[in-house]
């Protein structure tokens, strides 16, 4: 393992390399200092600790030659409250959005970052608002925000914020092309961001899971032809957005559905469960039944790459990639600089990871 970090203000470099039980550290290309350990595991932990120390001081790791599963980028964006670690990426470029809470909830900052870790744009969301989720509509250059269960749109052209819904007791958010899906006044709404018109509404009643949490989760397919929503603990509804025909999938009552995503070919629907199994379920949309051959352990987050047909799943410090054409695992790798949780999003060439340590990273896919 070898890491080279750069302070972009002073142009100073710092590198660390592990070889078995030995660790070698050098600054600004100078002679390396050697440090020995009893076990390779101890040496690896020391490398992580020292690397993290430099990241917190403003150094950035950028290695575009990284192999599959290796970090292309590490950048520390802050040690305060990381909140829900929202990410939004466009799969046609390697830029992505992340958000960070400043101080004691004084404001939230939203960063548009490139694959070198440079902040191309910084936007402020004033007031004590917590961003739960973000979705980018590239067609209209609007970053949709779910802040405190209120949906708003941040225009990248003029920086103005438009509120689309009032603050609600629960929320959901999805984007496909110029269409956005959210919850407003007891109804699911599909809104055309290009024409500023409502395409579809469906009144729903959100059931309480366990008597404490409202069950609400909805998503559009990648091409916008399908919508899935879950407002009851025992079923998921699939809507054909052309014919408005509805079909129902029966699901286990012992888990709350917190997130959903269609496969790029609309063959599968993946659902992330909470409180029950905490697993990633997979449903066959041809038979409207669960896939018996699909089994994952407890997961914390997942993401799908539409162009490459990849699925990334995070649990217990590791990410597993799956090929959605074969439904088979490909590579697995450890996430660096994470405590328990992280969020995932795919750019064109990389997997973005935002950890609860406040570290934003890119990992190579091939």
Language-model features: locations:
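Repeated scaffold domains used in trafficking and secretory/extracellular systems
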Residues: 81-89, 127-139, 166-178, 207-219, ...
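Short loop/turn segments that connect beta-strands within beta-propeller blades
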Residues: 114-117, 155-159, 193-196, 240-244, ...
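Short aromatic-glycine-(Arg/Gly/Cys) micro-motifs in beta-strand/loop hairpins
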Residues: 8-34
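Hydrophobic beta-strand positions that form the internal "hydrophobic ladder"
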Residues: 95-96, 142-143, 180, 227, ...
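Beta-strand-rich domains and repeat architectures in extracellular enzymes and scaffolds
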Residues: 76-108, 129
